[in-house]
């Protein structure tokens, strides 16, 4: 019997809940192996597609899609409980309620997608045998377009939270070859099409596979094959010599990181790791990169001796240092103050006064801030006050900021979950209006210690891998507790440190130049394709329907 077939009232909700839970496992290779993520994602989503398309009404389709997504988000984002309860100090029932409330909101987007697709694709019209192939192809394309459109809306509504976009389940699948052209939203469209095509193979009326309904599945296989071929193409070319980097993972326990009594301990650990001499045969680093908020207080709250110690590290190693630090600055001629979550770069020649005032030449200010963690949305001060989260209410950085020029390479930094928003990374890779060339390397600094050693770390690494595929640029990630890694321009993890362990990762990273179609146009091609499919679906929906 099909998931949408007759049976006890509890059967279909149970199947959708189980499929949603399985779907949550497909976004990072933990606990499932990497090769299984894409098949699990497509099969699980096919259950939701079939159930929603066979629903008796659009309202019932919304409920079925919402239930599936509710279980997917609740399990896939369980690590938010760790942040709110273990480190935010929120009572366990309230932390659990927070995860469920967010999941319920996020699940509205897939639910609405299922409702829209069901409204555009009634289950039993135009069902004559000659028309079945056309109908299943149309239905699969329409369902996929609705799903991908709502994935995109989830990425932009209320600052956006596109975590667990289904495209990330396909980093190691043939569909990844489409990333340089269509980005994650285009991959989501193709993955949703594959799921809907699989759902179309199952004919609920007879319980048998109907060969007439295999056209959409055949198209899905062709798209996967084309993705594999596209994946063989090189979209960028090397520029300059490889850059030697040292990535530092301090592994400072989150419960201790912002404790004033333990501030010196954390600083000393990072100083020691940054000061380690190169191993035998290992070249000296051109740049040492430390994670987000290595200094857990504003830079002007530290004595000059702390900055003297860091300058001494740069002097002894004959290198430059980039570190995440919260900055308190007062722009020239301004009466107000700015507070930013930033990365600063310096070397042995940098005056201490520049470091204490936050006026170093190399600086990046985070532009996409975390709601409740880095700024307070209107009406939610009460919620933030319940959490023990320091360093809130930051100011935003500019959309395009200068790269860090190091040894012939240009590094574009991003902080925390900014690498989740692919279009916002693109201005730094493109040539500036002043003719300044775009970045050749991307670097993410983050502190995922808020989430413990959970799926969040592996999911974040998958997100970074897809950004490199979209842009054909390498990316390095320096994190507090993991996963510190180097990813090449094809999305392959070249080196990584185990999570939950202090250490340094010496890597040689080859900078790349040249723009992929996605790096040039961002989400526009994918959105245009989604829009055309929706327009075609709406136009077909107005035609007279056969009984």
UniProtKB/Swiss-Prot annotation:
The chain crosses the membrane at residues 31-51, 65-85, 89-109, 144-164, 181-201, 215-235. InterPro entries: Apolipo_AcylTrfase, C-N_Hydrolase, C-N_Hydrolase_sf, LNT_N. It is a multi-pass membrane protein. Pathway: Protein modification; lipoprotein biosynthesis (N-acyl transfer). GO terms for cellular component: plasma membrane. CDD domains: ALP_N-acyl_transferase. Gene3D superfamilies: Carbon-nitrogen hydrolase. GO terms for biological process: lipoprotein biosynthetic process. The keyword Cell membrane applies. Coiled coil: none annotated. Belongs to the CN hydrolase family. Apolipoprotein N-acyltransferase subfamily. It is found in: Cell inner membrane. This is Apolipoprotein N-acyltransferase. Catalyzes the phospholipid dependent N-acylation of the N-terminal cysteine of apolipoprotein, the last step in lipoprotein maturation. NCBIfam families: lnt (TIGR00546). One of its GO terms (molecular function) is N-acyltransferase activity. The active site is at residues 292, 366, 416. Its main location: membrane. Residues 248-511 form the CN hydrolase domain. It comes from Bordetella bronchiseptica (strain ATCC BAA-588 / NCTC 13252 / RB50). The keyword RNA-binding does not apply. Keywords: Acyltransferase, Cell inner membrane, Cell membrane, Membrane, Transferase, Transmembrane, Transmembrane helix. Its EC number is 2.3.1.269.
């Amino acid at each position: 019997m099909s998931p949408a077939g007759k049976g006890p009232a509890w059967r279909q909700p149970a199947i959708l809940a189980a499929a949603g839970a399985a779907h949550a496992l497909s976004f990072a290779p933990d606990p499932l192996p990497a090769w299984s993520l894409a098949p699990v994602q497509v099969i699980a989503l096919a259950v939701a597609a079939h159930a929603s398309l066979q629903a008796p009404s659009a309202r019932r389709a919304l409920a079925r899609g919402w239930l599936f997504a509710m279980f997917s988000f609740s399990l896939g984002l369980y690590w938010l409980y760790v942040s709110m309860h273990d480190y935010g100090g929120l009572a366990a029932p309230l932390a659990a309620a927070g995860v469920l409330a967010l999941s319920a909101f996020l699940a509205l987007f897939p639910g609405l997608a299922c409702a829209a697709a069901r409204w555009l694709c009634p289950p039993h019209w135009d069902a004559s045998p000659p028309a079945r192939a056309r109908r299943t192809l149309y239905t699969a394309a329409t369902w996929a377009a609705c799903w991908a459109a709502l994935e995109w809306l989830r990425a932009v509504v209320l600052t956006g939270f596109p975590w667990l976009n289904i495209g990330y389940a396909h980093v190691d699948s043939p569909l990844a070859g489409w990333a340089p052209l269509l980005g994650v939203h285009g991959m989501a469209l193709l993955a949703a099409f594959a799921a809907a095509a699989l759902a179309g193979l199952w004919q609920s009326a007879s319980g048998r596979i109907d060969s007439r309904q295999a056209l959409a599945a055949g198209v899905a296989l062709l798209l996967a094959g084309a993705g594999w071929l596209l994946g063989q193409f090189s979209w960028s070319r090397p520029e300059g010599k490889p850059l030697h980097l040292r990535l530092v993972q301090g592994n400072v326990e989150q419960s201790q990181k912002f404790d004033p009594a333990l501030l010196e301990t954390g600083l000393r650990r990072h100083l020691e790791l940054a000061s380690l001499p190169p191993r035998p045969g290992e070249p000296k680093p051109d740049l040492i990169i430390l994670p987000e908020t290595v200094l857990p207080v504003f830079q002007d709250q530290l004595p000059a001796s702390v900055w003297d110690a860091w300058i001494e590290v740069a002097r002894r190693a004959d290198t430059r240092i980039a570190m995440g630090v919260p900055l308190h600055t007062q722009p020239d001629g301004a009466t107000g103050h700015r507070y930013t979550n930033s990365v600063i770069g310096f070397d042995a020649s940098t005056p201490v006064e520049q470091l204490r005032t936050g006026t170093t030449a190399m600086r990046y200010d985070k532009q996409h801030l975390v709601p409740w963690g880095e700024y307070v949305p209107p009406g939610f001060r009460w919620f933030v006050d319940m959490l023990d989260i320091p360093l809130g209410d930051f100011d935003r950085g500019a959309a395009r900021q200068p790269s860090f020029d190091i040894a012939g390479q240009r590094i574009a930094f991003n902080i925390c979950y900014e690498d989740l928003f692919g279009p916002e990374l693109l201005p730094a890779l493109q040539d500036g209006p002043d003719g300044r060339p775009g970045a050749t390397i991307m670097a993410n600094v983050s502190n995922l210690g808020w989430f413990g050693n959970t799926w969040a770390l592996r999911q974040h690494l998958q997100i970074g891998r897809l950004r490199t595929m979209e842009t054909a640029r390498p990316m390095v990630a320096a994190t507090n507790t993991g996963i510190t890694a180097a990813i090449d321009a094809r999305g392959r993890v070249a080196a990584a440190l185990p999570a939950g362990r202090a250490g340094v990762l010496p890597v040689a990273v080859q900078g790349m130049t040249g723009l992929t179609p996605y790096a040039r146009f961002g989400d526009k091609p994918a959105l245009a394709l989604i829009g055309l499919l929706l327009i075609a679906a709406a136009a077909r929906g107005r035609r007279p329907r056969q009984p």
